[in-house]
Structures are given as C-alpha cells and as structure tokens.
C-alpha cells in the first residue's frame, strides 16, 4: 500500500508528515481485528478515490444542507446544488469522542483524498463494531423474480420484426396522473423498438342467455334495450315567474302607476 500523506494542526503551526501503511495498520488494529484489517484498508482506498467529492463554501442561495441526527453522524455530510445537479461536502463536522479521538484528529488535519480515505475508515470501523456490513457491494439484494419475473423471455412480448422474446419494456414519458405513460418495448437482438400490444375484447355477451362465450371477438355493438329516461320538462322562464323585472334607463320616463 502506498504512503498516506497527512497534514496535522498544532497549537503554533501546521506540520505535514508522511504516514506509512504500517502506521495506519497500527492505528486500525486498536479498533478492528487483523482479519478485517486488509479488507477495510483496500475498500477505503477504492471508495475514497472513486467517490471523492469537491469542497466548496456554502455561499450560494440554491444550496440545501442535508441534516443528520447526531446518532447517525459518521463524519460525512453533504449539501446539494439544485442548479448544477451536483453534490458537495460542506462544513464537515465529526463528533469526536474518546474511543475514536486519534482517528478524528487525523481527519480534522487532512484534506483531499487523504481526508476521504480516513473518513471511510472511520465509517467502516463503526460498522464493524456494530456487526454491520460496510461494503455495499457485498450486500445481497432481495430477488423478487419468483413474484415479479417480468423480464423472463418465456413471458416477454415478442418482437414483431425478428419474433424474438429478448425484449425489455421502457417508460419513455410520464404524464399526468389521469393519463397512461408512454411505454415502448425494445428488442435486444434486432435493436428495434415497438409499441406494446393493446388489450382487445375477446368475449361475446349473449343477451338472451346471459352467458359469456370466450375467445370470440365482438364484431357489432350490442343494442341498448333499456327504457329511455323520462323527458325533463322545460324550465320556466324567469321573466314569467317574476324573478327578473324589466329595467329602465335613467333618461326614460318612469312608468305610470296603475290606478
């Protein structure tokens, strides 16, 4: 393993030192067993270099801080830039305690990928202490194929071009809640996409016997033999009922009173 360069703060000046891999192992051996030591260091080195996040000042108005409870604070805090669709680390705060004081002090005095490496180590140590898997790649996802095996080629929609069942449904566009989404099927063999099949009525309702004959397509519209609803009477005129009175202009002569 390569040397890890750490910069630590003192009361007077900032000093920098190179900490070899053996020193990191000696530090981690205080918290974890030797059996988990190599895997933890390798995982932290890989993830810290892969998921390194930039540091910026929280001066923009469009940045929302993600709040963590103190019990869930593992030393990694993020803020979201809603305008640029990026994530940044902002104002890192580490709950220092006596158990991880040495490692927390090293995190406070570092920056860049070295800081990320130590933060991942702190996260992995806490997970090992609690008996939880820290590497998300080793966590097995729940398989729902027995319940929702929608990608089985046996039941897939066949491609109209090459008749292959190696197809995948895709939602192209989502619409309002009262409208169906735009769905297309893509064929992995011929690289063509096609519209999904539509449902058609395949049963014929016999009005006389009230029996359903399956697998017979409806070819004509059934007559509506139900009695028609009663005709509603015309509404009375509001003028006839005296609801609306005749109006006169102010220049007109007032109407004469009936004697």
UniProtKB/Swiss-Prot annotation:
Keywords: DNA-directed RNA polymerase, Early protein, Host cytoplasm, Metal-binding, Nucleotidyltransferase, Transcription, Transferase, Virion, Zinc, Zinc-finger. SMART domains: ZnF_C2C2. It catalyses: RNA(n) + a ribonucleoside 5'-triphosphate = RNA(n+1) + diphosphate. Residues 226-236 have a biased composition (Pro residues). GO terms for biological process: DNA-templated transcription. Induction: Expressed in the early phase of the viral replicative cycle. One of its GO terms (molecular function) is zinc ion binding. The DNA-dependent RNA polymerase (vRNAP) consists of eight subunits encoded by early viral genes and termed according to their apparent molecular masses Rpo147, Rpo132, Rpo35, Rpo30, Rpo22, Rpo19, Rpo18, and Rpo7. The same holoenzyme, with the addition of the transcription-specificity factor RAP94, is used for early gene expression. This is DNA-directed RNA polymerase 30 kDa polypeptide. It comes from Vaccinia virus (strain Copenhagen) (VACV).
């Amino acid at each position: 393993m390569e040397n890890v360069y750490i910069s630590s703060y003192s009361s007077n000046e900032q000093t920098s030192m190179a900490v070899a891999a053996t020193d990191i192992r000696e530090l981690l051996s205080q918290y974890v067993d030797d059996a988990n030591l190599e895997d933890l260091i390798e995982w932290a080195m890989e993830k810290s270099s892969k998921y390194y996040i930039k540091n910026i000042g929280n001066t923009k108005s469009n940045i929302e801080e993600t709040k963590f409870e103190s019990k869930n604070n593992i030393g990694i805090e993020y803020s979201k830039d809603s305008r640029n669709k990026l994530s940044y680390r902002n104002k890192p705060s580490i709950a220092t305690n006596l158990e991880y004081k040495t490692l927390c002090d090293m995190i406070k005095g570092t920056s860049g990928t070295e800081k990320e490496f130590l933060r991942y180590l702190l996260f992995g140590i806490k997970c090992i202490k609690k008996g939880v898997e820290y590497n998300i790649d080793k966590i097995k996802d729940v398989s729902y194929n027995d319940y929702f095996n929608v990608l089985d080629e046996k039941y897939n929609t066949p491609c109209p071009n090459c008749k292959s069942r190696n197809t995948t449904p895709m939602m192209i566009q989502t619409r309002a809640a009262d409208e169906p989404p735009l769905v297309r099927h893509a064929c992995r063999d011929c690289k063509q996409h096609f519209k999904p099949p539509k449902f058609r009525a395949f049963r014929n309702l016999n009005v006389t016997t009230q029996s359903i004959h399956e697998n017979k397509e409806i070819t004509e519209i059934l007559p509506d033999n139900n009695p028609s609803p009663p005709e509603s009477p015309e509404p009375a005129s509001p003028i006839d009922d005296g609801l609306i009175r005749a109006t006169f202009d102010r220049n007109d002569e007032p109407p004469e009173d009936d004697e």
